[in-house]
Amino acid sequence: MKRASHFGMITALALSSAVFVDDATADERVISHDELMDKMSGFWIGQLLGNYIGFPFENNYVEEPIPVLVDRVYTADYAGSPELKINSKDRRGFIPLMAETLGGAFSDDDTDIEFVTLHAVEKYGLDITYPEITQMWKTHINDYIWVANREARNLMDRGLVAPDTGRKENNKHWFQIDPQLVNEIWSAFYPGMTQKAAERALWGARITNDDWGTHPTIAYGAMISAAFFEKDVRKLVDIGIKAVPNQGPFAEGIRDVVKWHSEFDNWRDTRDKIHEKYYAYKKGSYEAPVSVVSSLANGLTGIMAVLYGEGDFMKTVGIATSAGYDCDNQAATTAGLIGVLNGLSGMGEAAVKLTMELPLRSTWDKPFNDRYVNISRDEIKLRTPISEIVERIGAVAKTAILENGGRMEVRDGKTVYVVNSDL
């Protein structure tokens, strides 16, 4: 059975038969309902904030990183020192104005394709098929997409169905960053089930990408899933390494980043190494395509940010942004990861303050005014409470936990989930 009502049936069944048992076994991890939802909030709100911190600098810094450690949402009217290259011709340079006008967070491809995936999984189930997701893309995803996503969507109009839309022979952008930034939600669906999260993230990546162009998506898929229970960022990166096929430039690069992290105290030295070797990667007769939005250099700077950020939200997102390239994507992905690791409650005062002070003339009393405004996806309602989105992601996760050997219990009067984890 795999229809929308499946989630409600599973959850209701578990609630009506909650049991009391002793501690979980070695392969099981226990998380309370409250902690799970706090981490889901950190995941979604973290991605939003990371996106907005990185957005003003998207694609502006390539040869060198940004000369400051970005710690705020910059705007096009910035006139401080040092001089910074900020996008000034579109919404990327006017985020507070956009947020104030719309009354909350607004959609961008760092979250809105995941939002479509949420709708798709609610409609078809966790075992959604490629023909079904292709139809969801054709219905909801038509504008505000670029490179591999744009090419895949064009191919759908020509009659191709995923994963043919991501194959090298069909999609000339198969190596670009697109799948990393649109598939993190699979990790939230599978907390602590890193293999399932990575498998489904890869499934999603193949809609647009192929070969090593899917490898960063796999790594982050496993890492974000693991972050529900693992707080050591080095261990998270090791989990990402193990999830990725042991061939290709990203597999080589992620090991290099770990090595450089052990050699250099300053992340800027590691960024120099990444740019030198992986921006225009060559090995033997093989030359990787060169692009400011390639999954290779971008994916590696995200790993760098996770290591040097040491679990601190603002430090991690600051490094991910300041590293340059297509930096809003790394900022959003790593923000979602650290948001899971620490939960919204552990995101830190500076980060939470930013989510409530984006408007120009007022202050919200909840992150992003508890409002997600859809300005980019067709046939999805305009405004959705962020708290509702978080609850809906959590409902899918509960279903995944129960369908994969986990269970729901009541301990000391509180609901907990016992996850059949592979950590």
Stretches with model-predicted labels:
Residues 55-98, 111-113, 134, 144-146:
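Active-site-surrounding "flap" and adjacent substrate/cofactor-binding loops of secreted or lumenal enzymes
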Residues 45, 102-210, 214-217, 229:
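Active-site cavity-forming subdomains of large catalytic enzyme subunits
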Residues 49, 53, 60-76, 209-212, ...:
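Catalytic phosphate/nucleotide-handling subdomain of diverse soluble enzymes
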Residues 251-254, 258-288, 344-423:
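Acidic, carboxylate-rich catalytic segments that either coordinate divalent cations
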Residues 28-31, 155-174, 183-194, 202-208, ...:
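Accessory "access/gating" subregions that flank catalytic or transport cores
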Residues 21-26:
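Boundary at the C-terminal end of the N-terminal hydrophobic targeting segment
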Residues 8-18:
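Bacterial N-terminal signal peptides
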Residues 1-9:
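Bacterial N-terminal signal peptides that target proteins for export
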